[in-house]
Curated annotation (Swiss-Prot):
The chain crosses the membrane at residues 17-37. InterPro entries: T2SS_GspM, T2SS_M_periplasmic_sf. Gene3D superfamilies: General secretion pathway protein M, EpsM. Inner membrane component of the type II secretion system required for the energy-dependent secretion of extracellular factors such as proteases and toxins from the periplasm. Plays a role in the complex assembly and recruits OutL resulting in a stable complex in the inner membrane. Provides thus a link between the energy-providing OutE protein in the cytoplasm and the rest of the T2SS machinery. The gene is outM. Keywords: Cell inner membrane, Cell membrane, Membrane, Protein transport, Transmembrane, Transmembrane helix, Transport. It comes from Dickeya chrysanthemi. GO terms for cellular component: plasma membrane; type II protein secretion system complex. This is Type II secretion system protein M.
Amino acid sequence: MNELRRRWQVMSQRERLMALACGGLVVLCLLYYLIWAPWQESVRQWQMTVERERQTVRWMQQQPPRFRRRKVRGGRXPVAISANGIGAQSAVRYGITVLRMQPQESQVSVTLARSDFNNLLHWLAELEQKNGVITQGIDVTAVPNSPGIVEVTRLSLERVL
């Protein structure tokens, strides 16, 4: 420490001023790179996260009501589904064979034969849009070595007015 003090005293006024300026610059750089820049980066990341979450909320609000949790009020209550309600005729149009239908309270449990996955999705969409029948649950298994063909072992449907 004495060596530093001796060197400081040997320096001219101009050299001392330059050393102080350089020291101040080093301190400012350290503050910027060790504190300010990481803090700004974390703020930017949080802002991006908040914006992504806002976009997700907007997307969820724009989705059709079938993706929202149903509320049983205001005349929108589950009703028993008849065989016609499931749209057996529309199933045939889409090449879907209904093997078994079993009523369960306000739902109907349906077992289907192997069918084309895209046709199944179109059929379920038509049931919802035209008949007010929503899918409560579905178990789908891909058929090995048959691209696009699935086996539906359980399909629970419910009609909502």
